[in-house]
């Protein structure tokens, strides 16, 4: 399942990249607003609470604090490729740390000073929650979807607010593979490009 999702994300990203690169050969259309971020490489960090949306079995839902450092590469005026870190501290009812990398991620966004975006990604996460019902091993795969808004400041930096849904599972490596689904609300800051 996760392999198919990852392949679909890779195929979508490569298709969008090809379309974007072919569109870059056309002369630029006149724009009423100046481009807020002329650079290609960016760094941002976001953090916020995460809540398990549906607990497996009869256990109490997990709550955590999530931090997401992100390195982005602007492919087009509306498309960013991203590599994200995933750091979480589960605080209740079980305490544990979680860390991982999301190397296949992208963000599609509008232009201008206020940018609405949709994001998706897939990666690998290691968790200290192994053994609770739904997560039977330490290594798990993560798939995530998000939507948010960013306000670009005059110097090119930005503040953002994003709601993100993510699913952790071992992709059937160890039954019963119920996984964990969490929703997080992230507040972020992007450095000027």
What residue ranges belong to the model's regions?
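Predominantly the C-terminal beta-signal and adjacent terminal strand-loop region
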Residues: 148-193
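Membrane-embedded beta-strand positions of outer-membrane beta-barrel proteins
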Residues: 43-47, 81-85, 118-122, 145-147, ...
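Transmembrane beta-strands of outer-membrane beta-barrel pores
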Residues: 47-53, 87-91, 122-128, 151, ...
């Amino acid at each position: 399942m996760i392999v198919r999702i990852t392949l679909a994300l890779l195929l979508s990203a490569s298709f969008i990249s090809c379309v974007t690169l072919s569109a870059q050969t056309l002369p630029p259309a006149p724009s009423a607003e100046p481009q807020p971020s002329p650079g290609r490489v960016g760094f941002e960090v976001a953090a916020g609470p995460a809540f398990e949306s549906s607990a497996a079995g009869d256990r109490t839902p997990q709550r955590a604090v999530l931090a997401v450092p992100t390195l982005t590469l602007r492919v087009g005026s509306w498309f960013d490729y991203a590599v994200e870190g995933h750091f979480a501290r589960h605080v209740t009812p079980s305490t544990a740390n979680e860390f991982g990398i999301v190397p296949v991620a992208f963000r599609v966004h509008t232009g201008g000073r206020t940018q609405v975006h949709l994001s998706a990604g897939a990666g690998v996460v290691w968790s200290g929650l192994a053994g609770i019902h739904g997560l039977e091993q330490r290594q798990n795969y993560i798939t995530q979807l998000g939507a948010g808004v960013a306000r670009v400041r005059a110097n090119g930096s930005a503040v953002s607010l994003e709601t993100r849904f993510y699913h952790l599972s071992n992709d059937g490596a160890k039954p019963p593979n119920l996984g964990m689904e969490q929703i997080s609300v992230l507040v972020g800051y992007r450095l000027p490009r």
